[in-house]
Amino acid sequence: YRYRDPILDETTAVLAITQSGETVDTLAAMEEARDKGALLWSIVNAIGSQAMRTADGHITMNAGPEIGVASTKAFTTSIVDQYLLAIYLGQLRGTIDAEQRRQLVRDVARLPALIGDVLDDDARLHELAGELYPYTDFLYLGRGINYPIALEGALKLKEISYIHAEGYPAGEMKHGPIALIDENMPVLAIALQDDLYEK
C-alpha cells in the first residue's frame, strides 16, 4: 500500500481492517494515511490495540480471540461491520431510506441462523470433502464483489489444509489461467444470484 504512492488528502477517509491491531504493515499504512491528512478509522478485533489507539475512530469486531491461523471469525465479522457501515452511510447520504436500512439490518441478523444451517449439514460437507480430498490444486473464481471472497476462500484452503489454491477474477479466466485447468483441478465458483449471475 505505502509503495503505491496512494493519493490521499484531508478529503479522504481510510478504513484500516485488522484482527490483531498490531500488524506492522497495517500500522505503517495507517501512519502514511495520517501523514497525508486523511481521516483514519479502524475495524479491529483486539480491544486496546495500537490500531485502535492510532485511529481517529474505530469499530470493534467483537469476534473474540482467534485461535487458528485462518482468522475466520475476524474476517467474517469485519465483512459484517463493513456492510453495516455502508448501510448507515447510505442512509446518511440519502441513497437508502430508513425502511430499507431496517430491512438490510434484519437480513444481516438472519446470517447466524443461515450459517448454522450450512454447518448442520455435516453429512453433505463430509461427502464433499471425501470427493475433493485427493486433489492437490484448486481454483476459486468470483466476479465483482465476490472476487475478494474467492481470494479469501483460496487462502483459507491453503492455511487450513495445506493444499495449493488460487483465487482469480472469473472474467479474466480466458486470459491465460484457463490453459492450466484440467480434470485434476476442481474449480469453485462464487456465483450469487445477483446482476452477474448469468455471466
Language model features: what each stretch is:
Residues E10-T12, A38, Y135-T136, M185:
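Short coil/turn segments at beta-strand junctions that form active-site/ligand-binding loops
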